[in-house]
């Protein structure tokens, strides 16, 4: 997301600016390919955003930079599901790359379904990680026959630059 907002995705327009002799038209619609175009302005991107479960506000004057689009949305609808938003943008970029390198075209419904599944899995994994685990109960037990237990303790005192050991 930060690459798209800083306009450093390797789009055709950015590659051309960096001196690579390349046509900078979008493979899907023929318009100039920039991050803002791929992730928002392209007809295909608009179709994906349209079928997504996000209820996005209308962004007037269609900004060219993706960061401006993100700011507009955050100001007009701060309670948006940002995880869905970010994964949708990421999926649009991945779809562009897949097409560029010989992959198959996915329709907007399929992309939004994959976005929903990805975010659902992400949330489930994070939910299971966030549950605090109870520390195991520590209780003394008699050692096995032929074994000995030794209890030890160490304390370090920084101020006096000393330590103590107990066995």
Stretches with model-predicted labels:
Residues 1-167:
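Primary recognition of RNase H-like, Mg2+-dependent phosphodiesterase/nuclease domains
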